[in-house]
């Protein structure tokens, strides 16, 4: 939270809410906040997403969309996860990372993932064509600094798959 961010103090002091979490050890999306607010009709949920476009997209798919799907009564509120083969080497970050990719079906029926390019939170271009999010482990936790082309990685499907 920046020094000019008034959302958390407003939730706590003005709305008598509880911040359930205010920072997440992940990339992108570190400043994501989730809070609950008591109302006469029950507890209301508030998600505050980061301001950078890529961070907002990733945290929406990871947190907000599953919450909306659950509130709608869906039996399985999470988006599908599939094993995908990396089309190129991928460097790991010290934090767990959700890397934007384009996933397509291979001639053999497998899935392959191609990075959409630079993954900085502010890079809107990395959103273009992204239909998946690689769930990359932390380099700090694993002691591994990169994953190699051809390795299988879990990916969340966030759009229609492409074909080769």
Where are these regions (language model features)?
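ATP/NTP phosphate-donor binding region
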Residues: 1-4
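Flexible glycine/proline-rich
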Residues: 10-164
């Amino acid at each position: 939270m920046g020094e000019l961010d008034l959302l958390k103090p407003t939730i706590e002091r003005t709305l008598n809410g509880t911040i359930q979490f205010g920072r997440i050890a992940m990339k992108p999306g570190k400043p994501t906040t989730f809070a609950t607010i008591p109302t006469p009709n029950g507890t209301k949920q508030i998600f505050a997403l980061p301001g950078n476009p890529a961070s907002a997209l990733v945290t929406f798919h990871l947190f907000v969309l599953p919450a909306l799907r659950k509130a709608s009564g869906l039996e399985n509120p999470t988006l599908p996860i599939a094993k995908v083969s990396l089309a190129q080497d991928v460097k790991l970050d010290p934090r767990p990372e959700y890397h934007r990719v384009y996933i397509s079906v291979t001639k053999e029926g497998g899935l392959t993932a191609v990075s959409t390019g630079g993954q900085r939170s502010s890079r809107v271009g990395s959103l273009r064509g992204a239909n998946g999010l690689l769930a990359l482990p932390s380099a700090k936790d694993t002691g591994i600094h990169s994953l190699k082309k051809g390795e299988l990685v879990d990916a969340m499907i966030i759009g229609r798959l492409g074909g080769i």
